[in-house]
């Protein structure tokens, strides 16, 4: 199973319609688009998927739809994290029921939980996942949970934990984790340092911009396998030019707008309180969509 979890995993967006409801047909198209561009797997219901502005029922519905479209074709990881242990357990049980390959959970946030409470939270989710491997999700910039290296080392050695999504710019820590845990599946979480993360020891990555240019990230993996660091750097630079624009537009709404121009998503909206893309960026996003479609063809 550890080998199956390695690779380039798109952090899947969640499409909504003009009434702010889940757009299931666009979701299905997005899953098929990702499969078609050679993604190794999907990370479903995470930060990129706007999980924390969805109800539990909606999150379960997303898991069900994605499984219907992709089960058996690519690796599927269900992010089931919430502040509530019981709700996370409910989502973990759903992931097992729908045939996902693994579950993942961000560290519980907002309240100042003790580290032992964090550990108990993960143990409970792992138990409810009924044998599915756990991917611990460390994203201190958004969760506000600043784990020490020793705490990370403890979490990844809990029974049932097989992987870590390390969304941090600390590449020294990435290398330290890899050195301490050679058999751990280690994901780079920040797209803009994907190549550097691989060189620091990551097995692959989970990222939002893979939704629109996953083949570039696969190209970085292949270039480094072949020892062509210069090519990997060039591809990373091309990815980062896109990320520069998306940071200006707002990453999730920018990605959805590009996918709208690619005829993948019917509506390019995020769920409120996220606002639509500023109209001044639409020409640049449309040009980017055209460029990527030509590159992918």
Swiss-Prot record:
Positions of the catalytic residues: 137, 165
UniProt-recorded Gene Ontology molecular function terms: N-acetylneuraminate lyase activity
Localization per record: Cytoplasm
Keyword Ligase set for record: no
Binding locations of aceneuramate: 47-48, 167, 189, 191-192, 208
GO biological process, one term: N-acetylneuraminate catabolic process
Catalytic activity of the protein: aceneuramate = aldehydo-N-acetyl-D-mannosamine + pyruvate
Enzyme class: lyase
Assembly behavior: Homotetramer.
Protein name as it appears in the record: N-acetylneuraminate lyase
Species for this entry: Salmonella paratyphi B (strain ATCC BAA-1250 / SPB7)
Gene from which this protein is expressed: nanA
């Amino acid at each position: 199973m550890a080998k199956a979890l390695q690779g380039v995993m798109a952090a899947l967006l969640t499409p909504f319609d003009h009434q702010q409801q889940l757009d299931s047909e666009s979701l299905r198209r997005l899953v098929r688009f990702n499969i078609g561009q050679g993604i190794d797997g999907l990370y479903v219901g995470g930060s990129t998927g706007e999980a924390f502005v969805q109800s539990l029922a909606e999150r379960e519905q997303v898991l069900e739809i994605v499984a219907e479209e992709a089960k058996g074709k690519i690796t599927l990881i269900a992010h089931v994290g919430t502040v509530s242990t019981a709700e996370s357990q409910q989502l973990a049980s759903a992931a097992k029921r729908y045939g996902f390959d693994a579950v993942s959970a961000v560290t519980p946030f907002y309240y100042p939980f003790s580290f032992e409470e964090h550990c108990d939270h993960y143990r409970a989710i792992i138990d409810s996942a009924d044998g599915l491997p756990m991917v611990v999700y460390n994203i201190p910039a958004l969760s506000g949970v600043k784990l020490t290296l020793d705490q990370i080392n403890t979490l990844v050695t809990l029974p049932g934990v097989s992987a870590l999504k390390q969304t941090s710019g600390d590449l020294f820590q990435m290398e330290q984790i890899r050195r301490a845990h050679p058999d751990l599946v280690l994901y780079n979480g920040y797209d803009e340092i994907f190549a550097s993360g691989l060189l620091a020891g990551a097995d692959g990555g989970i990222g939002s911009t893979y939704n629109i240019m996953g083949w570039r990230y696969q190209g970085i993996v292949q270039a480094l396998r072949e020892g062509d660091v210069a090519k990997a750097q060039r591809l990373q630079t091309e990815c980062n030019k896109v990320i520069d624009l998306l940071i200006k537009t707002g990453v999730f709404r920018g990605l959805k707008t590009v996918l709208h121009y690619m005829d993948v998503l019917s509506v390019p909206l995020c769920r409120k309180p996220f606002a639509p893309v500023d109209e001044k960026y639409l020409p640049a996003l449309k040009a980017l969509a055209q460029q990527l479609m030509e590159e992918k063809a």
